[in-house]
Amino acid sequence: PPIEASESESLRDSTLLVLTAGQEQNVSACLDGNVKETGADKDLGNYVRIVASDDKELFLYGLSSISVEVGQPLLKSDYVGSIEAGGKLYVGLLIQGQPENPAAYFILKTGNV
């Protein structure tokens, strides 16, 4: 799971999963892959884009800090950055270039996403 969320919701026709952090915490990769891009989105904040070998791309937006570099290999659960208390983490997923509902690929439990 990227973070322990106090609540979750979907945006943009379920192509973005929004997780609210109850406290400041580290954000983890949700799949194995390589960091393809880092940057800042004017609407969603700082982000990391992770590309996996099986045509999946994971986007993590809303980070208060980024701890990875472009080209860096990552394993599932590796630390990629952090999010502030009360901050929103926006999770996007592409499969073969098409937006998919990230909630379908992650186990959602109360307190854990």
Put a short name on every predicted segment:
Residues E4-S10, V35, D41-K42, P99:
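Active-site/binding-pocket entry motifs
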Residues P2, T38-G39, L63-I66, I83, ...:
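Residue-level recognition of beta-strand microenvironments
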Residues Q25-V27, G33-K36, L74-G81:
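Generic structural signal for buried aliphatic residues
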Residues C30-S64:
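Zn2+-dependent peptidoglycan hydrolase active-site motif and core
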Residues T20, N26-C30, L60-Y61, G71-L74:
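Small beta-strand-rich domains/subdomains or short beta-sheet motifs embedded
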Residues D13-T15, Q23, L31, L44-N46, ...:
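Envelope-exposed proteins and targeting segments
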Residues R49, V70-V113:
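Conserved, short, structured surface segments that act as functional micro-motifs
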Residues P2-A29, A52:
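Short glycine/threonine/proline-enriched tight-turn/helix- or strand-capping micro-motif at secondary-structure
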